[in-house]
A protein has these predicted regions:
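Glycine-rich phosphate-binding/catalytic subdomain of phosphoryl-transfer
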Residues: 3-291
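Glycine/Thr-rich phosphate-binding loops that ligate phosphate moieties of nucleotide
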Residues: 3, 16, 20-62, 104, ...
């Protein structure tokens, strides 16, 4: 990050003195324990970490349960937060794991931070947490008049309140850039550092989805469907919650899948590169001037475009690291279903993209139970770089899909928008969002609806049909 920031100034006429503020966007639900100087006491744990299954089970799977959580604990959490920790991957259980397995580090810890907050601490020596990050701990009370850390929930889960940071708004000034941080970043000391936000908060903002009722779909390493609401909602049957947004009074009704683009990366490594005899050694096939492919992903997209919709009946489940919505199961895994002698790699490749889109349709339909999603959806992230995928998403969901400029960087754009609002450049995020430019529009092809609807019906049955087998094969590994 420090090298990149300095490199930016080498490619522009802007000087560090002209930078009036910075903010960060990062992955959420990480766990970073730091000392009083902001130094990490151990390797941070990412949102995908599953090591705390014993802590999760010991704390809240006893007695009568709903969605795998003790009903009393579930109701207390829902009453205060309109959500509950139902996944072993949640940061609360990472915190409890360190408490149980690394007591010396736990006692030395000054604050429990998320990824973005640890960067703010390094940059400013201030220990803060924006509301969206605080909410992702499932300890933040969202009730009017009660906003803040809920001491009752902390006691219930055994969280020490001394570890919790001061809560600020995403557009607040978190602190000023220190001399050391400024030197490392190539910026000026005293530059304002704003609260910023997590990726789940800011990717929608950077996509221009700030108005109530707007919907975006993100496909990066993970994936999600988010719809802006003016009130909180929760659907435990589908594991969807209205998470705190960047603006007070707005919430992102958020349905998440653990692996989206990561599935395409997996297929690139294991089904494509070996085909051209460069297994795991290259990501670019543009060695000769004759090739028309700028990258291997372009090659893969072009290959997919030549395969008929429906992938010859092959269906892929994109659950390579478990799943969260519409079912929470860390043991769930990927399947290539209905492979026959005539099935080729190109069909399997297309099936992966279709499987990701099927799952996104599933989440979109689940959101419709509690809110009205938008008829026109903004599609962002690395997956939106492929016109083939964009059209596929439109065809499978039956919605018009729009893409925006700089789609891989919408999280950073959202962070810049927060800094712009915080500094007074814009009065609110709606004004900033008006500057987000649409660069593509895809309408669904009605002729493809029958084949996609048929495959989608089968796709939705595959988890229920294999749930017991997933548990048999994969939950043994947790022990």
């Amino acid at each position: 990050m420090c090298r990149t920031t300095k490199a930016v100034f080498e490619k522009t006429d802007v000087t560090p003195a002209q930078v009036t503020g910075i903010s960060f966007c990062s992955q959420m639900q990480g766990m970073v324990l730091v000392d009083e100087y902001g130094r990490a006491l151990r390797r941070p744990m990412s949102y995908m970490d599953q090591r705390a299954s014993a802590e999760f089970k010991a704390c809240q799977t006893h007695g009568p349960c709903v969605s795998g959580v003790n009903i009393g604990m579930l109701l207390r959490s829902l009453r205060a937060t309109h959500a509950a920790s139902t996944s072993v991957k949640d940061p609360l259980w990472k915190y409890k794991w360190v408490q149980a397995h690394e007591p010396e580090i736990f006692q030395e810890a000054h604050k429990w931070l998320d990824v973005k907050e640890s960067l703010i601490a390094r940059a400013t020596s201030e220990f803060v947490m924006t509301r969206d990050s605080a909410y992702s701990t499932f300890l933040y009370d969202t009730r009017p008049g009660h906003e803040g850390w809920n001491e009752g929930l902390c006691q219930m889960y055994g969280v020490e309140t001394r570890h919790l940071a001061k809560i600020i708004e995403c557009t607040d000034v978190a602190g000023l850039l220190t001399e050391q941080a400024a030197r490392e970043l190539g910026l000026c000391p005293g530059t304002r550092v704003y609260g910023g936000g997590g990726d789940a908060t800011l990717i929608g903002v950077g996509a221009g989805c700030t108005a109530v009722g707007s919907t975006h779909i993100y496909s990066g390493t993970s994936g999600w469907v988010g719809t802006v609401m003016d009130h909180q909602a929760v659907d435990l049957s589908a594991m969807i919650a209205g998470i705190v947004g960047a603006e007070k009074g707005k919430y992102n009704y958020f349905a998440e899948m653990e692996t989206a683009g990561k599935c395409f990366e997996w297929v690139k490594d294991h089904l494509v590169l070996d085909e051209v005899n460069i297994y795991l050694s290259k990501t670019d096939v543009a060695e000769s001037q004759e090739t028309v492919y700028e990258s291997l992903y372009d090659y893969m997209s072009d290959t997919v475009a030549q395969v008929a919709s429906g992938s010859g009946g092959v269906i892929f489940t994109p659950w390579l690291h478990g799943n969260r919505c519409p079912f929470e199961d860390p043991a769930a895994a990927g399947i290539f279903f209905n492979i026959r002698l005539e099935t080729g790699k190109a069909q399997m490749l297309r099936a992966v993209l279709e499987g990701i889109c099927f799952h996104q349709r599933w989440m979109l339909e689940c959101e419709e139970r509690k809110t009205k999603t938008a008829p026109v959806i903004r599609f962002v992230g690395g997956g939106a770089l492929s016109k083939v995928t964009c059209q596929m998403l439109a065809d499978i969901t039956g919605r018009t899909v729009e893409t925006v400029e700089n789609t891989k960087d919408v999280g950073a754009i959202g962070a810049a928008m927060l800094a712009a609002v915080g500094s007074g450049l814009f009065p609110d995020l709606a004004q900033a969002a008006a500057h987000v430019k649409v660069n593509g529009r895809y309408t669904p092809d009605a002729a493809l609806k029958p084949v996609y609807d048929r495959n989608y019906r089968v796709f939705r049955q595959l988890y229920a049909s294999n749930k017991k087998n997933y548990a048999l094969l994969n939950r043994l590994k947790e022990g």
